Amino acid sequence: MKTIQKLILLSSILLLSINSYAQKFAYVDTDYILTKVPEFVQAEEKINEFSKQWQSEIEAAYQDVEQMYRTYQSEQVLLTSEMKTKREESIIEKEKSVQALQQKYFGTQGELYKKRQDLIKPIQDRIFDAVQQLAATNKYSIIFDASSDLIMLYSNPDLDKSDKVLELMGY
């Protein structure tokens, strides 16, 4: 009888200790959260406006290059070799300046990237802070982002804490 009591006591202690090491998981959908943040929607609209403006500026500059080339081709028979060389250099120089402008606006460290950093990064930081607060408050070990490349074949909707993050952000 005593061995059974000891066995039950040992089993209970073992089960309780395993349960205390259980980790809590949750997930959020940052794409969903971002669509619910008005500042993000406004920032995206501003970025799209800048992008369209810069794109039309670049397209107009490329049209100038094409017009220069068509003019050169039509007048080529009348030009001396020295004049041809100058025109070709002029066209090449103009094309390089348009490519530089395109890189300035849309390059990896271009104006579009900087605008995105200025307008969207603060919103992403607020989301990150709210997720950290949620994790600390509810003692979550891991919070996944459902909108990232992480493949979630199944997730319990009760574990989706996106609305809680929005609430912590004041939305």
Where are these regions (language model features)?
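Bacterial N-terminal signal peptides that target proteins for export
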Residues: 1-8
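Sec/Tat signal peptide C-region and signal peptidase I cleavage site
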Residues: 18-22
